C-alpha cells in the first residue's frame, strides 16, 4: 500500500527538488510518443527531480499499479473491479476478455456496414451524458473534415430544450436514435429517449423501437425498455464511463466517419498504451506529464490547469478533459481512507486558440496566481491556407514563450520610455508592463489531426491522469461525488411531484425552493 505522502522521505525529496528546479526552460525536453511530440521544456526540471521522481514512483508502487491496469487487476479498488479500457483498443485483447471484445467489435462493424449498404439512417441522434457523450461528440467534431457519412447530433442535458434543438429538421423516418447509458438507469439519456420516441410516434413511425439502439452494460434494462436484442451493444462493468469511448460507445463515430476511422482511433490509443507501458520514466510522455502535474499542484501551489488546443476542431476536447481529470482526481481519500495530505486534482478549464488569447490569457500572463497551460497544435493543417496556419502556430508559440520568459522591469522600463517622456510616468507604466514569467506549460504537437493522432492524444491524457492518481494515492476510477448528487436529485423530484408529501431532511434553502416551486401553477 502506498505511503501517506507528507510523512515520506521520497515525497519530501521530490517536493524539495521541484521547488529548486529550473522553471525557465534552460534544458530542451522533447519526448516522442506514438507519433506525437511532447515539449516539457517549460516545466520544472532537474536531474535531482528525475532521481526523486524515480524514488517516489517506487514508494507509491507505480509499476505494480500500472501492471494491474493492463492485466485486469482491481485498479478500481474502491469498487473491487478492473479499469480495463486498455483491453478495448488492443489489437489482440487479453485472453479473458478477447472473445467478448472482438465479438462486440464485429457486431458493431456489421451493423454499420449493413446500414451503409442499405443507405439507412441519414441522421443519427446520440443520447448520452458525461462519458457516454463527450468522447464520441468530441471525436466526430474533431474529424468531420474528412467527410461525414451521416449527420450525427448529440443531446445530453435533461433540459428538454437540448433534445428539441437536436431533433429540429431531422427526418423521423430516416433517423437512428442511440441511447447510451452504462447502467441504463441514468436520468438524462432515458428522459431524452422518451422525448425522441414520442417524436417518432407523433411522426407516424409504425414501430419506433426498430430505429432505436442501446449501448449499455445493463442488457436486461435495455430489453425491459423494449429494445430488441439485435439493437443492444454491450460494454462491461470494468469499463468506466469516462473511458468508454473505446467500447461500443464509439458507434456514432463509426456511423459518422466510418469503421476505418474508429479502427485508427483505437490504433492510436493502443500505440500510446505501449509507449506508456514500456518506455522508461525519463522518456515516458504520460508519466512526465503526470509528474509535472503533481509538482505544479501539490508543490508549487497552482490550483488549476488550462488546456488550449490551437485547433478549432478540438473545441470539445476541453470538456472531455475536464470530466476525465476532475471526475478522476477530484478526491482526497487514500487507500486506507486517510486524507492524501497534499492538494490533489486541479480545476481544468480552457478554450481553443486564438480565441483564448482574447479571453483569459491576460490573467495567465500577469495575475498573481497564474496556471500551467497545455498547448496543443497540429504541425500540418487540413485546409489550403498555409500562411494562416503558420500564423496560428506562431501565436501558440509566442504565447508559450511569453509565459516562460516573462518581461523583467528593466526591459519594461525601456519600452515605457519610448512612449512616455515623463520619467516618473514611464516608471509607473513599466510596472504595468512587467510579466513574471517562469509559468509552466507543455506543448503537444500532433503531425496532423488524424484519427490515429487523436487516439494517441486521448490515451496520453488518460494515462497521465492514472499516474497522478497513483502518485497521490487516490482512486481515479470511482466517482462517489457524482453518485451522491444523483441520489439527492431522486429524493427532490419525488417531493416536487407530490405536493402533499412531507419535505423531510432538507436544508432550509432547499426546503424553501421545493415549497416555492410546488406553489407554481
Curated annotation (Swiss-Prot):
Record keywords: Cytoplasm, Gluconeogenesis, Glycolysis, Isomerase
Pathways per UniProt: Carbohydrate biosynthesis; gluconeogenesis; Carbohydrate degradation; glycolysis; D-glyceraldehyde 3-phosphate and glycerone phosphate from D-glucose: step 2/4
Pfam families the UniProt entry points to: PGI
GO cellular component labels: cytosol
Active site (catalytic residues): 327, 358, 486
GO molecular function: carbohydrate derivative binding; glucose-6-phosphate isomerase activity; monosaccharide binding
Gene Ontology biological-process annotations: gluconeogenesis; glucose 6-phosphate metabolic process; glycolytic process
E.C. designation(s): 5.3.1.9
Coiled coil (residue ranges): none
Compartments where found: Cytoplasm
Catalysed reactions, as listed in the record: alpha-D-glucose 6-phosphate = beta-D-fructose 6-phosphate
Predominant subcellular localization, coarse grouping: cytoplasm
Top-rank lineage group of the source organism: Bacteria
Enzyme class (EC, first level): isomerase
Similarity remark: Belongs to the GPI family.
Primary role: Catalyzes the reversible isomerization of glucose-6-phosphate to fructose-6-phosphate.
Protein name, per record: Glucose-6-phosphate isomerase
Gene source species: Bordetella pertussis (strain Tohama I / ATCC BAA-589 / NCTC 13251)
Lineage, top ranks: Bacteria, Pseudomonadati, Pseudomonadota, Betaproteobacteria, Burkholderiales
Gene: pgi
Amino acid at each position: 500500500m502506498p505511503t501517506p505522502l507528507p510523512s515520506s522521505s521520497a515525497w519530501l525529496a521530490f517536493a524539495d527538488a521541484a521547488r529548486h528546479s529550473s522553471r525557465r526552460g534552460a534544458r530542451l525536453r522533447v519526448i516522442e510518443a506514438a507519433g506525437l511530440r511532447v515539449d516539457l521544456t517549460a516545466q520544472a526540471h532537474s536531474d535531482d527531480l528525475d532521481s526523486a521522481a524515480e524514488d517516489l514512483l517506487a514508494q507509491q508502487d507505480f509499476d505494480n499499479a500500472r501492471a494491474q491496469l493492463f492485466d485486469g487487476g482491481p485498479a478500481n479498488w474502491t469498487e473491487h473491479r478492473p479499469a480495463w479500457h486498455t483491453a478495448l483498443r488492443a489489437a489482440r485483447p487479453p485472453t479473458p476478455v478477447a472473445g467478448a471484445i472482438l465479438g462486440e467489435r464485429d457486431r458493431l462493424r456489421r451493423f454499420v456496414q449493413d446500414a451503409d449498404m442499405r443507405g439507412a439512417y441519414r441522421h443519427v441522434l446520440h443520447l448520452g451524458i458525461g462519458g457516454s457523450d463527450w468522447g464520441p461528440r468530441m471525436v466526430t467534431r474533431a474529424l468531420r473534415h474528412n467527410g461525414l457519412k451521416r449527420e450525427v447530433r448529440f443531446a445530453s442535458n435533461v433540459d428538454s430544450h437540448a433534445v428539441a434543438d437536436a431533433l429540429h429538421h431531422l427526418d423521423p423516418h430516416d433517423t437512428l436514435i442511440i441511447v447510451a447509458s452504462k447502467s441504463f438507469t441514468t436520468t438524462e439519456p432515458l428522459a431524452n429517449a422518451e422525448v425522441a420516441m414520442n417524436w417518432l410516434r407523433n411522426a407516424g413511425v409504425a414501430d419506433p423501437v426498430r430505429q432505436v439502439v442501446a449501448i449499455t452494460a445493463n442488457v436486461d434494462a435495455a430489453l425491459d425498455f423494449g429494445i430488441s436484442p439485435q439493437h443492444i451493444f454491450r460494454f462491461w462493468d470494468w469499463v468506466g464511463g469516462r473511458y468508454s469511448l473505446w467500447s461500443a460507445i464509439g458507434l456514432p463515430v463509426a456511423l459518422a466517419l466510418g469503421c476505418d476511422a474508429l479502427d485508427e482511433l483505437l490504433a492510436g490509443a493502443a500505440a500510446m498504451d505501449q509507449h506508456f507501458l514500456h518506455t522508461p520514466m525519463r522518456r515516458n510522455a504520460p508519466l512526465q506529464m503526470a509528474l509535472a502535474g503533481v509538482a505544479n499542484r501539490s508543490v508549487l501551489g497552482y490550483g488549476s490547469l488550462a488546456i488550449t488546443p490551437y485547433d478549432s476542431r478540438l473545441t470539445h476536447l476541453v470538456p472531455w478533459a475536464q470530466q476525465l481529470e476532475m471526475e478522476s482526481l477530484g478526491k482526497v481519500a487514500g487507500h486506507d481512507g486517510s486524507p492524501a495530505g497534499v492538494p490533489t486534482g486541479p480545476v481544468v478549464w480552457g478554450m481553443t486558440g486564438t480565441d483564448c488569447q482574447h479571453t483569459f490569457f491576460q490573467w495567465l500572463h500577469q495575475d498573481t496566481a497564474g496556471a500551467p497551460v497545455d498547448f496543443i497544435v497540429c504541425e500540418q493543417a487540413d485546409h489550403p491556407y498555409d500562411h494562416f496556419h503558420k500564423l496560428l502556430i506562431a501565436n501558440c508559440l509566442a504565447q508559450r514563450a511569453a509565459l516562460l520568459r516573462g518581461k523583467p522591469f528593466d526591459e519594461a522600463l525601456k519600452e515605457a520610455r519610448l512612449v512616455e517622456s515623463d520619467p516618473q510616468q514611464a516608471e509607473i507604466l513599466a510596472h504595468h508592463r512587467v510579466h513574471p514569467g517562469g509559468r509552466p506549460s507543455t506543448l503537444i504537437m500532433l503531425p496532423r489531426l488524424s484519427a490515429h493522432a487523436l487516439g494517441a492524444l486521448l490515451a496520453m491524457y488518460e494515462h497521465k491522469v492514472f499516474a497522478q492518481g497513483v502518485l497521490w494515492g487516490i482512486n481515479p476510477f470511482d466517482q462517489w461525488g457524482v453518485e451522491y448528487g444523483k441520489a439527492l436529485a431522486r429524493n427532490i423530484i419525488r417531493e416536487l411531484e407530490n405536493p402533499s408529501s412531507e419535505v423531510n431532511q432538507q436544508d432550509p434553502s432547499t426546503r424553501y425552493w421545493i415549497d416555492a416551486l410546488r406553489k407554481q401553477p
